[in-house]
Amino acid sequence: MFVLSGYEYLLGFFIICSLVPALALSASKLLRPSGYAPERRTTYESGMEPIGGAWIQFNIRYYMFALVFVVFDVETVFLYPWAVAFHRLGLLAFIEALVFIAILVVALVYAWRKGALEWS
């Protein structure tokens, strides 16, 4: 008997997962237009020609707002399954969710007091 008798489907899955992107990339390379017009090399931004250079420094406040957004977006990802299964999980899961929310509220208050949420 073959040693890997239960893994043929897994091997086939990995082969298909490797071939599909390779075939898609090859097909797009074969079917794309070959000529390049000078307009194709220009920067396109919302239908308007950009003014100034592309290498400008952004304010660090954008980073802070994005970081706070990601934290609370991840919170939503964790709390949604908990809310769906709330009735089946019991009291311990409720207390764990309260601790999780409390930690995030403490982090939000800390960021607020440090001025991370103020623009000026």
UniProtKB/Swiss-Prot annotation:
It is an enzyme of class 7 (translocase). It catalyses: a plastoquinone + NADH + (n+1) H(+)(in) = a plastoquinol + NAD(+) + n H(+)(out); a plastoquinone + NADPH + (n+1) H(+)(in) = a plastoquinol + NADP(+) + n H(+)(out). GO terms for biological process: photosynthesis, light reaction. Its main location: membrane. One of its GO terms (cellular component) is NADH dehydrogenase complex. Keywords: Membrane, NAD, NADP, Plastoquinone, Quinone, Thylakoid, Translocase, Transmembrane, Transmembrane helix, Transport. This is NAD(P)H-quinone oxidoreductase subunit 3. It comes from Nostoc punctiforme (strain ATCC 29133 / PCC 73102). The lineage of its organism: Bacteria, Bacillati, Cyanobacteriota, Cyanophyceae, Nostocales. The gene is ndhC.
